[in-house]
């Protein structure tokens, strides 16, 4: 999957929120947001799939520790529409990441890497980032 934006040295601390707004492609199959220490150490791989890898209208989350993927977690809540502008807010603490979807629904994903700061963000797939904000 082609990578769009890559940012490093973010220094996002526990309790702070990363707000990502972007446009989902009209013919979207999937997109992703990766957060962590670097490309091989991700506390969150956030992958909404419209129709990809055998999943339809499902959010797949995972982590990557020293290049090794963990166990996938699937969310059936799927407020994304092709051709729409969406906003996702992600915050974290020592135990969990909290992902707030465009419709206000929130779910948690374990902070398996126990990161104390998030320094890396990448985005890819059928998603064009319009705005990244820290709160």
From Swiss-Prot:
GO terms for molecular function: lactose binding; laminin binding. Keywords: Acetylation, Apoptosis, Cytoplasm, Extracellular matrix, Lectin, Phosphoprotein, Secreted. The modification N6-succinyllysine is found at residue 108. One of its GO terms (cellular component) is cytoplasm. The keyword Transferase does not apply. It is found in: Secreted, Extracellular space, Extracellular matrix; Cytoplasm; Secreted. The modification N-acetylalanine is found at residue 2. The modification N6-acetyllysine is found at residues 13, 29, 108, 128. Gene3D superfamilies: 2.60.120.200. Homodimer. Binds LGALS3BP. Interacts with CD2, CD3, CD4, CD6, CD7, CD43, ALCAM and CD45. Interacts with laminin (via poly-N-acetyllactosamine). Interacts with SUSD2. Interacts with cargo receptor TMED10; the interaction mediates the translocation from the cytoplasm into the ERGIC (endoplasmic reticulum-Golgi intermediate compartment) and thereby secretion. Lectin that binds beta-galactoside and a wide array of complex carbohydrates. Plays a role in regulating apoptosis, cell proliferation and cell differentiation. Inhibits CD45 protein phosphatase activity and therefore the dephosphorylation of Lyn kinase. Strong inducer of T-cell apoptosis. This is Galectin-1. It comes from Bos taurus.
